[in-house]
A protein has these predicted regions:
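Active-site neighborhoods and metal-handling regions in enzymes and metal-associated proteins
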Residues: 1-134
Length: 134
């Protein structure tokens, strides 16, 4: 949500986070490990110019793009370096790429379940407007 009109730079950043999310979803859905999906998303963010802003502002950046959800809110596996296993069928994960700058933050967050044919979005996903102004 945006208070007032979202400046073009922020729309571009939001679209970048959508692209990162889609890349990570594709990797995980094809059986890649959480670690490889993290690397792919991080590398894409670097290419987009968000090196010092992905998941926080340098040096206070979280080193993950999402986490499993279960009995606890944040569970393993995590979309991060060192989680060298794929999501198994039935695994539920929140995928939440975001960038944070001095003048604001923007990102996406949806929850996905791993199935036989890839990941399925459990939250609003593409059926919800990418951003709303008021």
């Amino acid at each position: 949500f945006s208070c007032g009109r979202l400046p073009e730079i922020w729309i571009e950043r939001l679209n970048d986070m959508v692209e990162i999310r889609e890349s990570v979803v594709k990797k995980l859905g094809s059986g890649e490990t959480c670690s490889r999906a993290w690397e792919s998303g991080r590398d894409l963010a670097i290419e987009m110019g968000h090196t010092d802003h992905l998941m926080g502002m340098n040096p206070h950046q979280a080193k993950f793009l999402g986490h499993s959800v279960g009995l606890e809110l944040d569970e393993s596996p995590v979309l991060a370096n060192g989680f060298d296993r794929a999501m198994h069928e039935g695994c539920i994960m929140a995928i939440e790429p975001k960038v944070i700058y001095d003048d604001g933050a923007v990102g996406t967050e949806d929850t996905w379940v791993a199935g036989k044919d890839g990941l399925e979005c459990l939250t609003s996903g593409k059926s919800f407007p990418l951003h709303a102004e008021w």
